[in-house]
Amino acid sequence: ILIEKTIYTAALFFFRFGLLSLRSPIWLQKRCQIRGLDILQNHIDNNENVILMVPHSWAIDVPAILLASKGMPVSAMAKKQKNDVTDWLMHKQRVQYGGRVYERSGGIKPFLKSIRDGYVGYYLPDQDHGPEHSVFVDFFATRKATLPGLGKIAKLSRSKVLPMFASMNTEDGTFDIEILPAFELDKGDEQDARTCNQAIEYFVSSKPEQYMWVLQLLRSQEDGNNYYNIFKPRYDTDWQVKK
């Protein structure tokens, strides 16, 4: 059932994806409900830097575009798409009302500088970047290779970290965005990584179909196995998840 709901949610979102660029900012604002916007606004009004910790939901780009349309442009890092046309279209959509998106391969310094310059940081915490860059901490009923560096990024950019999650209502096509109060990330890499995962668990538990499970979030395992290849012998294909 979860697989069916996830595919249905993803398909509906992609059918509406182009509307984020084709329609006006007023159209988008009328179709978004934000809980906790006052939390973010209070930090900005107090001249405090902010990083939004945003798990990979299907609607992950919506809050960034929405906030920029409200005069709060964000700064993010992203991996270049393999298709140049797709990469150009996605970049144009993300920064259409302001903001910055840096190529991840260029390092973190431009991202940190933009936050210190007043942009709202947009940090994606949940992709598996391999065991050499991660710590293994609890995630739901398993253990997950999790990036440990958000606490250091917050310290270097002198920022408050606010968890945020975006979801799409599949009944009417509107978007729901929830922002939580800032949490502290100063207890060491493993505890900080676990704190991030707990925030993801909170968001995803009530709306699991909104999450991008297709990202192979559990590819790296402490025992070295690659569980995404378990069912490979059932199919006449040499497809394999990259290690």
What kind of region is each of these model predictions?
Residues 1-54, 87-92, 98, 177, ...:
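Membrane-anchoring hydrophobic helices of lipid-metabolizing enzymes
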Residues 2-5, 9, 92-96, 191, ...:
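A non-catalytic, amphipathic alpha-helix used as a structural packing/dimerization or gating element
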Residues 4-5, 25-30, 54-56, 73-76, ...:
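Short acidic/polar alpha-helix capping motifs at helix-coil junctions
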Residues 12, 46-105, 117, 132-135, ...:
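Catalytic core of membrane glycerolipid acyltransferases/transacylases, capturing the structured
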Residues 30-33, 83, 101-104, 143-144, ...:
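A conditional alpha-helix N-cap/helix-loop micro-motif detector
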Residues 38, 58, 151:
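Active-site phosphate/pyrophosphate-handling residues
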Residues 41-45, 69, 73, 105-243:
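Non-catalytic C-terminal accessory region of glycerolipid acyltransferases
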